[in-house]
Amino acid sequence: MCNRLVTVTGVAMVVAAGLSACGQAQTVPRKAARLTIDGVTHTTRPATCSQEHSYRTIDIRNHDSTVQAVVLLSGDRVIPQWVKIRNVDGFNGSFWHGGVGNARADRARNTYTVAGSAYGISSKKPNTVVSTDFNILAEC
């Protein structure tokens, strides 16, 4: 009787350990972000995303280039607040809601798209303010 109890207890422990190992959360790596600036598409490392209150920040860093976008989450709507583009193909520029440039944003599950035009300076025309189209696709 004592041997059966030890055997049943041992089997129960093995089954419990197996089930708990299967029940642990699996993390799936995020996809690479895609940036299109002035018609040229770049695939970068996955975006770093954070959220404070209703504002989601999407931060994409790749070598010497940086793109940051902040969107306001309001119910099902995603409203772009600002985008800063630094040193992407020699372009440095910004979009600001109610200010310079224009943008629209969309969210499909956990993938954000922010697209529009930014004003700034390009190394191609360093003495002229230019408007450049951008498209950001990032998973958060």
UniProtKB/Swiss-Prot annotation:
Annotated source species: Mycobacterium tuberculosis (strain ATCC 25618 / H37Rv)
Membrane topology designation: Lipid-anchor
Name of the protein in its database record: Probable lipoprotein LppE
One annotated Gene Ontology cellular component of this protein: peptidoglycan-based cell wall
InterPro entries: LpqH
Keywords: Cell membrane, Lipoprotein, Membrane, Palmitate, Signal
UniProt similarity note: Belongs to the mycobacterial 19 kDa antigen family.
Covalently lipidated residues, kind N-palmitoyl cysteine: C22
